[in-house]
Amino acid sequence: MAGLELLSDQGYRVDGRRAGELRKIQARMGVFAQADGSAYIEQGNTKALAVVYGPHEIRGSRARALPDRALVNCQYSSATFSTGERKRRPHGDRKSCEMGLQLRQTFEAAILTQLHPRSQIDIYVQVLQADGGTYAACVNAATLAVLDAGIPMRDFVCACSAGFVDGTALADLSHVEEAAGGPQLALALLPASGQIALLEMDARLHEDHLERVLEAAAQAARDVHTLLDRVVRQHVREASILLGD
């Protein structure tokens, strides 16, 4: 990584993007007929799959049931071939548990859980290929899967990462940019209200720079929303045609 120029004098990144430019996003909904909701997304070379079941009765001990809202259960996993490491991660390892917790916190802020008291909503996300922005891809795939399941949400929840290189805020970091070790943040946003569902930083950043990086992530999340909204509308149109409406 030594000597790698992350941002050229002309303002181009390693992969040819401008500072605030997203990687190419492709997504599909309804990829698994057996699930209540499902979606697949590619953000650059990062690929994630999300499956949703519920709302359904609480599984296991009924003491876990919440009298005023649904219990949101999120589980994260990554395929053993998803990174260059080829390292087998045990199910329930620390990274997977942390990601599952982050996803749960994110979707508890977005799903209208009070409409389904004493029930459970399961969100399973698997990363098939990791090349930067893993959390964001998981959130965006899960949002589409929750919508596919017909579960009411306050708003879309859209996520993107951002970093700071050579005095410039970069949106939607690739693996190369993440591996360089500069300050990075991950943001999950409810775009209509501007409410932040989750914000995480992994390094210190001066207050003057933080606002710029946060705005880069927020604008990127709004751009993601535009793309996801298009995917949802296309899915609804295709479903209507199949149903003969």
From Swiss-Prot:
Residues of the signal peptide: none
Keyword Acetylation annotated: yes
Gene Ontology cellular-component annotations: cytoplasm; cytoplasmic exosome (RNase complex); cytosol; euchromatin; exosome (RNase complex); intracellular membrane-bounded organelle; nuclear exosome (RNase complex); nucleolar exosome (RNase complex)
Modified residues (N-acetylalanine): 2
Keyword terms of this UniProt record: Acetylation, Cytoplasm, Exosome, Nucleus, RNA-binding, rRNA processing
Membrane-crossing residue ranges in chain numbering: none
UniProt-listed Pfam families: RNase_PH (PF01138), RNase_PH_C (PF03725)
GO aspect biological process, one term: RNA catabolic process
Compartments where found: Cytoplasm; Nucleus, Nucleolus; Nucleus; Nucleus, Nucleoplasm
CDD domains according to UniProt: RNase_PH_RRP41
Gene Ontology molecular functions: 3'-5'-RNA exonuclease activity; mRNA 3'-UTR AU-rich region binding; RNA binding
Domain of life: Eukaryota
Assembly information from the UniProt record: Component of the RNA exosome core complex (Exo-9), composed of EXOSC1, EXOSC2, EXOSC3, EXOSC4, EXOSC5, EXOSC6, EXOSC7, EXOSC8 and EXOSC9; within the complex interacts with EXOSC2, EXOSC7 and EXOSC9. The catalytically inactive RNA exosome core complex (Exo-9) associates with the catalytic subunit EXOSC10/RRP6. Exo-9 may associate with DIS3 to form the nucleolar exosome complex, or DIS3L to form the cytoplasmic exosome complex.
Similarity comment: Belongs to the RNase PH family.
Job of this protein: Non-catalytic component of the RNA exosome complex which has 3'->5' exoribonuclease activity and participates in a multitude of cellular RNA processing and degradation events. In the nucleus, the RNA exosome complex is involved in proper maturation of stable RNA species such as rRNA, snRNA and snoRNA, in the elimination of RNA processing by-products and non-coding 'pervasive' transcripts, such as antisense RNA species and promoter-upstream transcripts (PROMPTs), and of mRNAs with processing defects, thereby limiting or excluding their export to the cytoplasm.
Protein name: Exosome complex component RRP41
Source organism of the structure: Homo sapiens
